[in-house]
Amino acid sequence: MAQKPVDNITQIIGGTPVVKLRNVVDDNAADVYVKLEYQNPGGSVKDRIALAMIEKAEREGKIKPGDTIVEPTSGNTGIGLAFVCAAKGYKAVFTMPETMSQERRNLLKAYGAELVLTPGSEAMKGAIKKAKELKEEHGYFEPQQFENPANPEVHELTTGPELLQQFEGKTIDAFLAGVGTGGTLSGVGKVLKKEYPNIEIVAIEPEASPVLSGGEPGPHKLQGLGAGFIPGTLNTEIYDSIIKVGNDTAMEMSRRVAKEEGILAGISSGAAIYAAIQKAKELGKGKTVVTVLPSNGERYLSTPLYSFDD
């Protein structure tokens, strides 16, 4: 049924569809389903936390229209916050590692936000440090996606229950999500574990920065994943296992899914699908594996992910 008109674009965040992968999954493997979070109005899963963090601050009297928001972001949270701020009448300033794609930078500017780039070698730590400096210098409000409880909470209240509704009458045997802030994994994982006590919750992290696995942080190309530290928004008790994914592996899977499934997905989505397929092979036929595709491939057309010689 078609949705009724809404008063504000933020009202259409959530309610994203789920699609079964048909061509990239082996016949003897479990069914793999992907939740298309890039169908949110700002183009990514981060729209959910952007609205949740702003509305929490409004309820607590921390911000009013005309105020300025500052946030360190690898891109998608910034884009979510930028469009929510534009819709609600706030100004926005974002600090971001210089290694992030040109599309991400341009999208932030298109929504009227100011962008401050930090050294790529410092990863998200550099962006976080710069945001703190700007906050202290100008008195800006910082939502702090890596610490804000509204982040995992919105996934517990929306994304998780949506999956329960979408899979009503079925059992989800494994749920996987890439860990950036860990909000999706923590919030959805909590809901699904309550409904399916035997479910396996799997964290996905970059092979080149295996911090969750006890390794050292390092530079990697899986934009949005692997912040280089364990965020306060990640419930480390919620996941049962970790799958590490390499840069090239994630990119190859993103390209395959575009060509073989008609789903144009971002780099972290490629990592999620690769990990989900590995888990599906392990579980075998008759089981159900679900993952989340955080963002759309159009956000990466200037990156090596979708650069073509001809």
Curated annotation (Swiss-Prot):
Keyword Amino-acid biosynthesis: yes
Enzyme class: transferase
GO annotation terms (biological process): cysteine biosynthetic process from serine
Residues bound to pyridoxal 5'-phosphate: 76, 180-184, 268
Catalytic activity annotation: O-acetyl-L-serine + hydrogen sulfide = L-cysteine + acetate
Cofactor(s) in the UniProt record: pyridoxal 5'-phosphate
InterPro entries the record matches: Cys_synth (IPR005856), Cys_Synth/Cystath_Beta-Synth (IPR050214), CysK (IPR005859), P-phosphate_BS (IPR001216), TrpB-like_PALP (IPR001926), TrpB-like_PALP_sf (IPR036052)
Keyword RNA-binding appears in the UniProt entry: no
Molecular function terms, GO-annotated: cysteine synthase activity
E.C. no: 2.5.1.47
Subunit and partners: Homodimer.
Protein name as annotated: Cysteine synthase
